[in-house]
A protein has these predicted regions:
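N-terminal metal-binding scaffold of metallo-dependent hydrolase/deaminase domains
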Residues: 1-41
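Divalent metal-coordination and catalytic microenvironments
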Residues: 10, 24, 29, 50, ...
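Hydrophobic alpha-helical hairpins/lids featuring a short glycine-rich hinge
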Residues: 55, 60, 86-127
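Active-site gating loops and adjacent loop-to-helix segments of metal-dependent hydrolytic enzymes
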Residues: 68-100, 172, 177-180
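Metal-coordinating catalytic core of metallo-dependent amide/deamination hydrolases
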Residues: 91-94, 121-190
């Protein structure tokens, strides 16, 4: 078989100490073969030097729409300040699609550089920010598809029942490609229960 890439002399995570290193053949962006001294030709060969090869990291909870905004918020230095959500809420009306895209791209690039290959990001929708955060992050799915699988969770950070219009924005987010629905139950009163 011909490969696009062969990583030679690599150690798999489940390999026993006495097992020899192995080769990994990649074709069309996918692992096509794993075997010691893999035959066939390759457009590119990389020496693993006996180093560990493992699955990429998964970032399961990040908010790309709000990444890198600390300088815009008047936040305390405590781990989780009581007013953090309110301070973010006060500045998110300034978000533009282009602004979100630029900030989120920088964060994604850092995550890719540290080995992340899958990411689930929560993106706020409400009448204050509309769909700008979602559109800004959505623009990055195809741009970074080569390195990371980006899943978007649409989320009513400031509440659903207490924030008229949020439900329509959530539906629009789901119709627009979001695959997961998040929630912020601490913002909802208990009278309806």
């Amino acid at each position: 078989m011909d490969f696009d890439l062969v990583l030679r002399d690599a150690r798999l995570a489940d390999a026993k100490p006495d097992q020899p290193a192995t080769d990994i053949g990649v074709k069309d962006g996918r692992i096509a073969a794993i075997a010691p001294q893999l035959g066939g030709s390759a457009k590119e060969q990389v020496q693993g030097g006996g180093r560990l090869v493992c699955a990429g990291f998964v970032e399961t909870h990040i908010h790309l729409d709000k990444s890198c905004i600390l300088a815009r918020c008047d936040c305390e230095t405590k781990r989780f300040p009581h007013l953090a959500m309110e301070r973010v809420s006060a500045v998110k009306h300034t978000f533009t699609v282009e602004d979100v895209t630029a900030r989120a791209a920088g964060t994604i690039e850092k995550c890719i550089g540290h080995g992340a290959t899958r990411m689930r990001t929560h993106v706020e929708v409400d009448p204050r920010v509309g769909l700008r955060g979602l559109e800004g992050v959505k623009a990055l799915i195809d741009r970074y598809r080569w390195a990371i699988d980006l899943e978007i969770c649409v989320m009513p950070q400031e509440g659903l029942l207490n924030n008229p219009g949020t439900d329509e924005l959530m539906v629009a987010g789901l119709k627009g490609g979001c695959r997961v629905v998040g929630a912020a139950p601490y913002k909802i009163g208990r009278a309806h229960v």
